[in-house]
A protein has these predicted regions:
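Domain-level signature for proteins that mediate thiol-based redox and metal-cofactor handling
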Residues: 1-165
Length: 165
């Protein structure tokens, strides 16, 4: 598997790594199928809604660490609204590409950033918390990829929805 020099640089010397004590918001996302996990911590200026500090912790492969690193670089100094617009393709492009089997790492990093922003918005009454129901569970499970076949957990019917049948 060939990695770009930017991926290797962000993997070997990740930016914004660590944990913010008393963050304004945080989120942890992961994929049980591949074992990757990312946590993102935010400090946000309450008046301007600008991300003043952002840190991440990652458990995963080189692509996972590199995409979390680049996402934090891209979000730092942006308003929450602008940071929400950062997409997985933009993150992968900023790293000069990712191997096709590692694109899910940029999706995971973007999802984690958006969940951290949502956490901030909910805590500050800027958004409502998502409802917990069968549809939200199914949507979350569609993000979990079974790596040997590249299909999502829902399609493979590897789970049952306890209490929703």
């Amino acid at each position: 598997m060939q990695y770009s020099q930017k991926v290797l640089d962000h993997f070997m010397k990740p930016h914004n790594i660590g944990k913010i004590e008393n963050p304004d918001a945080m989120a942890t996302e992961g994929s049980p199928a591949c074992g990757d996990q990312v946590s993102i911590y935010l400090k946000v200026n309450a008046k301007t809604q600008v991300i003043e500090d952002i840190k991440f912790q990652s458990y995963g492969c080189a692509s996972n660490i590199a995409t979390a690193s680049i996402i934090t670089d891209m979000a730092l100094g942006k308003t929450l609204e602008d940071a929400k617009k950062i997409g997985w393709k933009e993150a992968a492009d900023a790293l000069d590409g990712l191997p096709p089997v590692k694109i899910h790492c940029s999706v995971l990093a973007v999802d984690t950033l958006r969940k951290a922003i949502k956490d901030y918005e909910v805590k500050h009454n800027l958004a409502k918390a998502d409802k917990f129901n069968k549809e939200t569970i199914v949507e979350e499970l569609k993000k979990i990829i079974y790596p040997q076949v590249g299909e999502d957990i829902v399609t493979l019917k590897m789970v049952k929805y306890a209490g929703f049948e």
